[in-house]
Swiss-Prot record:
Protein name according to UniProt: Photosystem I assembly protein Ycf4
Domain of life assignment: Eukaryota
UniProt keyword Membrane present: yes
InterPro entries named among the record's database cross-references: PSI_Ycf4_assembly (IPR003359)
Native source species: Pleurastrum terricola
């Protein structure tokens, strides 16, 4: 996680309730993918070495001395050139040495192609985005529907509180206690249609007008604090990997720092079901010292208000 961007979102509509107009604090951590110096280095070295193995194997098949024997073109002195020409280089037999070298050369070319293809697509790149809402939030649609008061309901020549009570009777007939978000649009269309049975039931009689179009407003999405993890993958259904977890699902931030031949420097997101989601770009990490890794993990745990675990 190389960079951190703090963004405040202030795009709210006029219909957004006041308790939802809290600007969330958003942090974005940019993740470096396959386009790093080490991948460029190994892709070049593997490609160069595999070409050398393949040319040596081909030269043994055609009984050439060596396709990479270039002293005739890069000699800097005639005396050195004449002395080198007197040396007879051994001819490599095609079976089994040349055949094995051709195999390793082709295998190396496939590996280098995989590395260059990963670099081109920037596999593993993405970001970790954290949304923290500090204001009052509602976790269910029923809580939102219960919070609607009579001032939000409008009617033509009718008491809005009576419409609300009649509507509750209607919803109880449908085995629901409050306005259901999934059927709100359908219910809104029925209430604005004077000839519908729902409208006649809600108004309580023919002398009462139906609800206006603004009586029911679409239910806004519930803003819950969450973390979004986005990564670029290989072409196919997993080209875009987009994971989202609620802050309530996060139990801790796990820090792993292992030294040695197979070093490991990672920051993981530990969920309540004991799953661990990698937050860094690679198992080797982007930090040189343990202090840098610890500082990044502690800031993240403090921002999420969760525990910090160590593993070494």
């Amino acid at each position: 996680m190389n960079a951190e961007i703090v963004v405040n979102n202030s795009n709210f509509s006029s219909n957004t309730p006041p308790f939802l107009k809290k600007q969330p604090e958003i942090r974005r951590y940019i993740i470096q993918g396959s386009r790093r110096f080490s991948n460029y280095w190994w892709a070049f070295i593997v490609c160069l070495g595999s070409i050398g193995f393949l040319l040596t194997g081909i030269s043994s098949y055609f009984e050439f001395q060596n396709l990479l024997h270039l002293q005739n073109y890069f000699s800097f002195a005639n005396e050195a050139q004449s002395s080198l020409n007197k040396v007879e280089l051994p001819i490599i037999l095609f079976f089994p040495q040349g055949l094995v070298m051709c195999f390793y050369g082709i295998l190396g070319l496939f590996l280098s192609f995989y590395l260059w293809f990963s670099i081109f697509l920037n596999i593993g790149a993405g970001f970790n985005e954290i949304y923290i809402y500090t204001g009052e939030t509602l976790k269910t649609e029923n809580q939102y529907s219960k919070s609607i008061n009579s001032n939000n309901l409008k009617a033509n020549n009718w008491n809005s509180s009576k419409i609300k009570s009649n509507l509750k009777k209607f919803t109880k007939m449908k085995d629901t206690q409050t306005i259901d978000y999934s059927s709100e649009n359908e219910l809104k269309n029925q209430l604005t249609n004077p000839n519908s049975a729902v409208c006649k039931f809600a108004k309580g009689g023919s002398e009462v007008g139906c609800w206006e179009q603004s009586a029911l407003t679409p239910l806004p999405p519930t803003p819950l604090s969450h973390i979004r993890i986005f990564r670029w993958g290989f072409p196919g259904k997993n080209r875009k990997i987009n994971l989202q977890y609620s802050i309530d699902q996060i139990s801790a931030i796990k820090l792993e720092f292992l030294q040695g031949f197979n070093s490991k420097r990672t920051i993981c997101l530990k969920l309540s079901d004991q799953r661990e989601i990698l937050l860094t770009g690679s198992p080797q990490g982007d930090w040189e010292t343990f202090e840098q890794l610890e500082k990044q993990a502690s800031e993240l745990a403090k921002f999420l208000k969760v525990n910090l675990e160590f593993s070494s």
